[in-house]
């Protein structure tokens, strides 16, 4: 094999193995550290847009509670196609990277649980 073919093969493999795009980076990859200045609020959802998306099938709001896999959550699936990360809720809670969704409820992108850290007095502190 000539040196030229070897070099082309090497750089070809290098190009294929080092690509990392926003939507498909591996955990711990080049873009795994999120710049918290770039995190935006997740899109509104639910009746009269009074809630916020916590996952592709979860919409929660203080006034309306939480919806799971209903027509109120359809808009949340749009988040999968947006290039920048988002965050709903203000106070972190739970053991799985969740945020307080409403009084007493902690949600991450997959599920919601009851959490005393999210009681009414401290939800937005």
Swiss-Prot record:
Domain of life where this protein originates: Eukaryota
Disulfide bond entries: 20-25, 42-86, 45-59, 53-76, 60-66, 93-106, 100-118, 107-112
PROSITE patterns for the chain: NEUROHYPOPHYS_HORM
Keyword Disulfide bond: yes
Keyword Transmembrane: no
Database matches in Pfam families: Hormone_4, Hormone_5
Modified residues (Glycine amide): 28
Signal peptide: 1-19
Tissue specificity field: Mesotocin is produced by magnocellular preoptic neurons in the hypothalamus in amphibians, reptiles and birds.
Subcellular location(s) of the protein: Secreted
GO annotations of cellular component type: extracellular space; secretory granule
Swiss-Prot/TrEMBL keywords: Amidation, Cleavage on pair of basic residues, Disulfide bond, Hormone, Secreted, Signal
GO molecular function list: neurohypophyseal hormone activity
Family: Belongs to the vasopressin/oxytocin family.
Primary role: Mesotocin is a diuretic hormone.
Name of the molecule in the record: Mesotocin-neurophysin MT
Natural source organism: Bufo japonicus (Japanese common toad)
Classification of source organism: Eukaryota, Metazoa, Chordata, Craniata, Vertebrata
């Amino acid at each position: 094999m000539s040196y030229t073919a070897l070099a082309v093969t090497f750089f070809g493999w290098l190009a294929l193995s080092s690509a990392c795009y926003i939507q498909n980076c591996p955990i711990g990859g080049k873009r795994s550290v999120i710049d918290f200045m770039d995190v935006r609020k997740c899109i509104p959802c639910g009746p009269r847009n009074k809630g916020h998306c916590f996952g592709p099938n979860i919409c929660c709001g203080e006034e309306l509670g939480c919806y799971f896999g209903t027509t109120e959550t359809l808009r949340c699936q749009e988040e999968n196609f947006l290039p920048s990360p988002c965050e709903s809720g203000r106070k972190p809670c739970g053991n799985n990277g969740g945020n307080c969704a409403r009084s007493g409820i902690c949600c991450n992108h997959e599920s919601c649980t009851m959490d005393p850290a999210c009681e009414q007095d401290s939800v937005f502190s």
